[in-house]
């Protein structure tokens, strides 16, 4: 499927739309679905030591993860995988997944969502999930609004 994208975007390190997800996850969107006619999002996630999202599923989006820094435990559909720097994981839609930075230092991954539009989810989720005493029901409602379901808590190290 060809996507007609005529907008040119060039960004240097650290540039892009900065958003925050849950505690310990900062995001830098290099392009959003708005830039790509809905085709994809491309963003960097700075993951705190031993940080990662809760177990969840995307009902419509596929996700890829490319590890730039750190070592990650990735849960994909009931299987556990360990991915080092330079490693890659493809997470199909409708498959439960989560990841965890296993290192004592911050990790960094590139994430691509297909189709795009994920930045809107993070714009809404960030302030809610980072609030003191974050309301899990409110967080779950944001997931549902954007075509995802929260299934459990974050992964733990072995």
Q: Which residues does each PLM region occupy?
A:
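Ligand-binding loop in jelly-roll beta-barrel domains
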Residues: 36, 93-119
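A short, N-terminal "cap"/entry segment at the start of jelly-roll beta-barrel domains
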Residues: 1-40, 132-158
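Hydrophobic small-molecule pocket/channel-lining residues, especially in calycin-type beta-barrels
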Residues: 51, 59, 72, 120, ...
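Short acidic-glycine-tyrosine-enriched beta hairpin
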Residues: 10-12, 78-96
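A hydrophobic, small-residue-rich beta->alpha segment in the mid-to-C-terminal subdomain
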Residues: 108, 119-132
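Conserved short histidine dyad/triad with adjacent acidic residue
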Residues: 28-29, 41-58
């Amino acid at each position: 499927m060809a996507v007609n994208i005529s907008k040119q975007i060039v960004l240097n390190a650290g540039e892009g739309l900065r958003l925050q997800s849950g505690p310990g996850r900062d995001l830098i969107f290099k392009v959003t679905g708005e830039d790509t006619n809905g085709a994809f999002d491309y963003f960097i996630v700075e993951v705190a030591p031993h940080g990662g999202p809760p177990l969840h599923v995307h009902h419509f989006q596929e996700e890829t993860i490319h590890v730039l820094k750190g070592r990650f435990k990735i849960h994909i559909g009931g299987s556990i995988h360990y991915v080092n720097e330079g490693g890659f994981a493809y997470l199909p839609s409708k498959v439960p997944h989560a990841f965890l930075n296993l290192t004592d230092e911050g990790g960094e991954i590139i994430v691509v969502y297909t189709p795009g539009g994920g930045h809107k989810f993070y714009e809404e989720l960030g302030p809610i999930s980072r609030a003191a005493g974050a309301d899990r029901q409110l967080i779950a409602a944001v997931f549902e609004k954007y075509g995802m379901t929260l299934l459990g808590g974050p992964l733990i190290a072995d």
